[in-house]
């Protein structure tokens, strides 16, 4: 019987959790750290605020948010892979954070009330969900009026020549790295499939607007290999 996208993604991340951080660095040549740092700068996270990291995985962005809001703030990380969360829990424990809560849950139906968070993020997770718009609307729902919702994700490079190299890298080399470093050729084949099928920057910006966000900002990284989308939930909504 053919697996649904959600079932396949869940199986992938349950299997690669122990190698995920290392492979992230290998695949992106460690650029994902710089991309997230720049995104955080643009978010201008304030002390004492409340944030949610959707599809938090091993909690790297969750931890960055926790450092930004400080001990007077509050941060939640949510993921549907218990194995990924276990890795994240160890990181949170090592840092002694008392204001971070990791939650096992589904991005398609966030277990939080409306208008709860000042910041809602999703990093390299939106491409893996069954329905992009459903998740964007859920993030919109739980954001406070005036809150910021941010997606950092792979994108579709527009530079001629570089785009072809990018697709060749994702299709052939990345799964090979997965086989060498994580013994998971099939799983990393899935990651390149999801990246290839994900909307480009302009299309995703339009989806943000359709979900209700205003003042949508887009920042491409490394010739469009990745992109940040930042939207605001209107005041009074």
UniProtKB/Swiss-Prot annotation:
<dbReference type="InterPro" id="IPR029063">
    <property type="entry name" value="SAM-dependent_MTases_sf"/>
</dbReference>
<protein>
    <recommendedName>
        <fullName>Demethylmenaquinone methyltransferase</fullName>
        <ecNumber>2.1.1.163</ecNumber>
    </recommendedName>
</protein>
<dbReference type="InterPro" id="IPR014122">
    <property type="entry name" value="MenG_heptapren"/>
</dbReference>
<keyword id="KW-0808">Transferase</keyword>
<dbReference type="Pfam" id="PF01209">
    <property type="entry name" value="Ubie_methyltran"/>
</dbReference>
<comment type="pathway">
    <text>Quinol/quinone metabolism; menaquinone biosynthesis; menaquinol from 1,4-dihydroxy-2-naphthoate: step 2/2.</text>
</comment>
<dbReference type="InterPro" id="IPR023576">
    <property type="entry name" value="UbiE/COQ5_MeTrFase_CS"/>
</dbReference>
<feature type="binding site">
    <location>
        <begin position="106"/>
        <end position="107"/>
    </location>
    <ligand>
        <name>S-adenosyl-L-methionine</name>
    </ligand>
</feature>
<feature type="binding site">
    <location>
        <position position="58"/>
    </location>
    <ligand>
        <name>S-adenosyl-L-methionine</name>
    </ligand>
</feature>
<dbReference type="GO" id="GO:0032259">
    <property type="term" value="P:methylation"/>
</dbReference>
<keyword id="KW-0474">Menaquinone biosynthesis</keyword>
<comment type="function">
    <text>Methyltransferase required for the conversion of demethylmenaquinol (DMKH2) to menaquinol (MKH2).</text>
</comment>
<dbReference type="GO" id="GO:0043770">
    <property type="term" value="F:demethylmenaquinone methyltransferase activity"/>
</dbReference>
<keyword id="KW-0949">S-adenosyl-L-methionine</keyword>
<dbReference type="GO" id="GO:0009234">
    <property type="term" value="P:menaquinone biosynthetic process"/>
</dbReference>
<comment type="similarity">
    <text>Belongs to the class I-like SAM-binding methyltransferase superfamily. MenG/UbiE family.</text>
</comment>
<dbReference type="InterPro" id="IPR004033">
    <property type="entry name" value="UbiE/COQ5_MeTrFase"/>
</dbReference>
<keyword id="KW-0489">Methyltransferase</keyword>
<feature type="binding site">
    <location>
        <position position="79"/>
    </location>
    <ligand>
        <name>S-adenosyl-L-methionine</name>
    </ligand>
</feature>
């Amino acid at each position: 019987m053919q697996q649904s996208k959600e079932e396949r993604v869940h199986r992938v991340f349950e299997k690669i959790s122990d190698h995920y951080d290392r492979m992230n660095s290998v695949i992106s040549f460690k650029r994902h750290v710089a991309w997230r740092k720049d995104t955080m700068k643009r978010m201008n996270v304030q002390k004492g605020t409340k944030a949610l990291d959707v599809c938090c995985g091993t909690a790297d962005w969750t931890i960055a948010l926790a450092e930004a809001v400080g001990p007077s703030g509050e941060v939640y990380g949510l993921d549907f892979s218990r194995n990924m969360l276990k890795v994240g829990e160890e990181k949170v424990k090592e840092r002694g954070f008392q204001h971070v809560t990791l939650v096992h849950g589904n991005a398609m139906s966030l277990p939080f009330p409306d208008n709860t968070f000042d910041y809602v993020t999703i990093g390299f997770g939106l491409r893996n969900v069954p329905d992009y718009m459903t998740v964007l609307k859920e993030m919109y729902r739980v954001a406070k009026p005036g809150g910021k919702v941010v997606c950092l994700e792979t994108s579709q490079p527009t530079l001629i020549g570089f785009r072809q190299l990018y697709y060749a890298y994702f299709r052939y080399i990345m799964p090979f790295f997965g086989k060498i470093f994580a013994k998971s050729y099939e799983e990393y084949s899935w990651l390149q499939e999801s990246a290839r099928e994900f909307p480009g920057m302009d299309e995703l910006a339009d989806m943000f607007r359709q979900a209700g966000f205003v003042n949508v900002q887009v920042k491409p990284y490394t010739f469009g290999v990745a992109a940040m989308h930042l939207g605001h939930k209107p005041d009074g909504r």
